[in-house]
Amino acid sequence: MNRQSTLVHQRLEAVEDLAQLQGLSDETIVSCLRERFLSDTIYTRVGSSALVAVNPNKYVPSNADSVMHKYAGEYRAAQPDKAQQPPHIFQLANNAYYHMRRTTQDQSILLASVSLLSFVYIYILIRK
């Protein structure tokens, strides 16, 4: 792999929001998701209220309870300059919950999966 190719892969891996990709195409999206997947970064934002999760078919430390508590703490902290956590299903669930609490409007989280096991696993993470 040459230096330019390595830089492209590193740049795609660093993209946390698919809406921020330059030259948006199917190939760019798949390449970005692939690079993130290969580094065990399985969650990627799509704008401010959507998330893509690629099932790694293995344990990923980012789904641990300790990580869940970090995301919950992100919303309890009142620091205006706090760094935002990387995209995660815990973050999406927190956003929906706290938006519901602030606005008293119902919220929905839609799940789509080709695998029932993946669907159930993400559902369990959301329910935590």
Question: What annotation goes with each model-predicted range?
Answer:
Residues M1-A112, L117-V120, K128:
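N-terminal entry segment of cytoskeletal motor ATPase domains
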